[in-house]
């Protein structure tokens, strides 16, 4: 049975064609704010129900509850603030109850917002609670500290879609739910990734697939830290893996356009909620899910799920997988009795170093077809000037 949306109803904040025309005619009169790409894609995520039950950016009550209790003000589990930051100068003529136009970086209006509340926030308090650190080297902390002085909350209505370079990999929740039903999948396991797949990922996915009907591989495309794989590399690598090593009727590959927050445990629950909205009944939570550096304990992202028995999606906790030459394949500590001399630990960092040196990782770490797909790219990793 496809999972019900979080909160019971799939949000739709996309304007009808008639309403779009009306709004477009009104936009010229409204205060306009230009938002960066990561905010713009989250406007779309709200509108298309990926962030259900949110209908807009958080007002202070929901924001405070999420920050302190990891729940919305109605007690529904929700672990990460979804906020719109603004400069006081941008909204100097705006008061609560007004409408404003949200423009993307191309200066094209993408949505209107009904302003419910404008409020101040404490960036340090936000960062400490969300990321468990104030270290400026943490990418989420660094990004938070650069945000603007005020937050503005209220419902949004989408009037224009963004440019989407990954159109052929894009499915909205309303579409995945139809697709899963057409496939007659009653149980669907979601997999979040920001990496190209190695054998450890494949092992975990196939282990989950053995007792569910379908696997939903949902790579995150959007803002990530330098050194992470580029979006197009991840998609090419997964396409190669699925083509050569997965039963074609058991897997759906589609992107999630949003930013990585690197919020570890909180983000693991957030990722599970989003996949529930796509229709997943189960969600794979690996070691150090959504982690970065050493800010979180290895299995902290699994332990947090104990606080959410009412989440409505079943987390699947997996231990680290490795290649055992004695077993002759990929295994985990739970099923392999052999000493370390037989084990090849799969390090994502080590694989990235090999690829940077244009060296093909060995088949005990990564499928050759996947490695070849990655090495076709001259620069497979993100860099920011």
Can you describe what each PLM-predicted range is?
Residues 1-385:
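Active-site cores that bind ATP or allylic diphosphates and position pyrophosphate for catalysis
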